[in-house]
């Protein structure tokens, strides 16, 4: 057996081709940790109908950003960068919740290398049962079904880690460099939305998001900021305000220069590359903004990778 430690990066994944969009959506809508559609025995059937109905529109969006999600390549780049920082005692692997490489494939790769000690590191900074909770539940299901024994450790949140806050602040400064003078710019944090019912039932996601915003904005005294939520899906009550509603509100109050900061996303994917860069940018143009920019995503930011390395070292004690 190897004396190395495996670091398993947990991420949601994304379709790696246009043909993969429908099965990716099927996996997503079949997950009762993220969405409960009717009784459990009916969800697979209903999920199949929803995936088939939604896939043509989603395929068009992926076509506009290159025909696939970049999230696998970006997450694998994060894994390689993290392995370089951690050094010889570690191997880093990637497990995607809704696409490839799957959790089962990732664990099989770890097993082939003879590694028995695994740190599961969620790449969702803010804990929610719909994101980290779902990924960890899937990991535990696969472990139980496989019968393979690993020494498991978990990192399930890092919303207030100083290096994560540093990394976000660095990207915001990069974004603000596109504006002059600084005093005229407002900052809009855009986090992935959740059904309000999750928060009502005690999910800590919203509190985590707000704390991240508070800690980041301590670095930007005098800059006006706002928080909104993107990527709603379905006819339930979602966290408010939505990002598109906030864009309208700020435009009505004569805001002309806006930096949008993607929050809860640690790498580029459809929510940044299409929803923000195309859809919200077009809306901002129609609303009369003079300058609308997005701060760069964390991706392989050295400060962010250092954050992940510190999380690994801390959980090992």
UniProtKB/Swiss-Prot annotation:
InterPro entries: Ferrochelatase, Ferrochelatase_AS, Ferrochelatase_C, Ferrochelatase_N
Binding-site residues, Fe cation: 192, 271
EC number of the protein: 4.98.1.1
Catalytic activity: heme b + 2 H(+) = protoporphyrin IX + Fe(2+)
Pathway recorded for this protein: Porphyrin-containing compound metabolism; protoheme biosynthesis; protoheme from protoporphyrin-IX: step 1/1
Gene3D superfamilies, per the entry: 3.40.50.1400
Main location: cytoplasm
Compartments where located: Cytoplasm
Cellular component annotations (GO), alphabetically ordered: cytoplasm
Isomerase is among the record's keywords: no
Entry-linked HAMAP family: Ferrochelatase (MF_00323)
Record protein name field: Ferrochelatase
Organism, scientific name: Geobacter sulfurreducens (strain ATCC 51573 / DSM 12127 / PCA)
């Amino acid at each position: 057996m190897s004396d190395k430690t495996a670091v398993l990066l947990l991420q949601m994944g994304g379709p790696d081709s246009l043909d993969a969009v429908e099965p990716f959506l099927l996996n997503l809508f079949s997950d009762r940790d993220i969405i409960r559609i009717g009784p459990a025995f009916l969800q697979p059937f209903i999920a199949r109908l929803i995936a088939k109905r939604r896939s043509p529109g989603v395929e068009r969006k992926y076509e506009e950003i290159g025909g696939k999600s970049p999230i696998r390549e970006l997450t694998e780049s994060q894994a390689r960068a993290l392995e370089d920082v951690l050094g010889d005692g570690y191997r880093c692997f990637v497990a995607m919740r809704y696409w490839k490489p799957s959790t089962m494939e990732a664990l099989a790769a770890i097993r082939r290398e003879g590694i028995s000690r695994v740190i599961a590191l969620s790449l969702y900074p803010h804990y929610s049962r719909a994101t980290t909770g779902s990924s960890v539940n899937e990991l535990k299901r696969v472990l139980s079904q496989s019968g393979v024994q690993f020494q498991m450790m978990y990192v399930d949140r890092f919303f207030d880690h100083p290096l994560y806050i540093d990394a976000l602040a660095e990207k915001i400064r990069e974004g603000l460099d596109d504006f002059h003078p600084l005093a005229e710019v407002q900052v809009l944090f855009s986090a992935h939305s959740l059904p309000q019912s999750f928060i009502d039932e005690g999910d800590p996601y919203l509190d985590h998001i707000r704390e991240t915003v508070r800690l980041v904005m301590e670095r930007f005294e005098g800059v006006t900021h706002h928080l909104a939520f993107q990527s709603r899906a379905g006819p339930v009550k979602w966290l408010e305000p939505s990002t598109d509603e906030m864009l309208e509100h700020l435009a009505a109050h004569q805001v002309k220069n806006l930096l949008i900061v993607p929050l809860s996303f640690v790498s580029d994917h459809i929510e940044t590359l299409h929803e923000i860069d195309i859809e919200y940018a077009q809306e901002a143009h129609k609303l009369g903004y003079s300058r609308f920019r997005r701060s760069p995503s964390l991706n392989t930011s050295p400060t962010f990778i250092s954050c992940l390395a510190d999380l690994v070292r801390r959980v090992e004690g």
